[in-house]
């Protein structure tokens, strides 16, 4: 049986480390810390990539962009997203919509959510209203609650591209 839709779910987390900003959804956000990561550590784009790859059973971001590969050292995660989008389109699929949740105490995501939505929609060549970015805290529980790191969850609906 063949379906015209696929659903994917992704998750990413990074610990805070030295730095003065974090990348979130392709947007540079000022913060008291950076993140510890091989690439730019954009948890939003990483979770989104995993959701896209998972929807078509294409593995995960670590398989496509392993941290052991120096090509991806300090890489812009927008490259990862565009690569994943290309894999989908080669197979006749595209993102219909994406719903992303950032989990952290700080930085505050709300003031940057529209810019993040615009960046993601632009990278995927989809409508702005097909991208949702929101944030929540963990009520000071766990590593995000203690301010030790940041996490993101993403869900995507893929649709077949009409021939």
Swiss-Prot record:
An example of a GO molecular function for this protein is:
metal ion binding
The residues listed in the UniProt record as binding a divalent metal cation, with positions renumbered to this chain, are: 12, 14, 46
Q: What is its EC number?
A: 4.6.1.12
Q: Report the cofactor remark.
A: Binds 1 divalent metal cation per subunit.
Keywords recorded for this protein, A-Z: Isoprene biosynthesis, Lyase, Metal-binding
Mind listing the GO biological process terms from this record?
isopentenyl diphosphate biosynthetic process, methylerythritol 4-phosphate pathway; terpenoid biosynthetic process
**Which pathway, metabolic or otherwise, does it act in?**
Isoprenoid biosynthesis; isopentenyl diphosphate biosynthesis via DXP pathway; isopentenyl diphosphate from 1-deoxy-D-xylulose 5-phosphate: step 4/6
Q: Which SUPFAM superfamilies does the protein's record reference?
A: IpsF-like
Which cofactors are reported in the record for this sequence?
a divalent metal cation
Asked if the keyword ATP-binding belongs to this entry, the reply reads no
The record ties this protein, via CDD domains, to: MECDP_synthase (cd00554)
Chain positions recorded as 4-CDP-2-C-methyl-D-erythritol 2-phosphate binding sites: 12-14, 38-39, 60-62, 136-139, 143, 146
- Pfam families, sorted: YgbB (PF02542)
Keyword presence, Lyase = yes
Q: What's this chain's function? A: Involved in the biosynthesis of isopentenyl diphosphate (IPP) and dimethylallyl diphosphate (DMAPP), two major building blocks of isoprenoid compounds. Catalyzes the conversion of 4-diphosphocytidyl-2-C-methyl-D-erythritol 2-phosphate (CDP-ME2P) to 2-C-methyl-D-erythritol 2,4-cyclodiphosphate (ME-CPP) with a corresponding release of cytidine 5-monophosphate (CMP).
> To which protein family does this belong?
Belongs to the IspF family.
The entry describes its oligomerization and partners as:
Homotrimer.
Name of the protein: 2-C-methyl-D-erythritol 2,4-cyclodiphosphate synthase
- State the organism named in the record: Xanthomonas oryzae pv. oryzae (strain KACC10331 / KXO85)
Give the lineage.
Answer: Bacteria, Pseudomonadati, Pseudomonadota, Gammaproteobacteria, Lysobacterales
- The gene for this chain is ispF
């Amino acid at each position: 049986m063949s379906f015209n839709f696929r659903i994917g779910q992704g998750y990413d987390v990074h610990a805070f480390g030295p730095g003065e900003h974090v990348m979130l959804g392709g947007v540079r956000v000022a913060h008291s810390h950076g993140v510890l990561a091989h690439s730019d550590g954009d948890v939003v784009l990483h979770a989104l990539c995993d959701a896209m790859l998972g929807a078509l059973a294409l593995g995960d971001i670590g398989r496509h962009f392993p941290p052991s590969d120096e090509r991806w050292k300090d890489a812009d995660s927008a490259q990862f997203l565009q690569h994943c989008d290309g894999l989908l389109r080669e197979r006749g699929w595209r993102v219909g919509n994406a719903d992303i949740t950032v989990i952290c105490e700080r930085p505050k995501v709300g003031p940057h959510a529209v810019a993040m939505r615009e960046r993601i929609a632009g990278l995927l060549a989809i409508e702005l209203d097909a991208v949702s970015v929101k944030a929540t805290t963990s009520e000071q529980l766990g590593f995000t609650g203690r301010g030790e790191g940041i996490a993101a969850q993403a869900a995507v609906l893929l649709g077949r591209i009409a021939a």
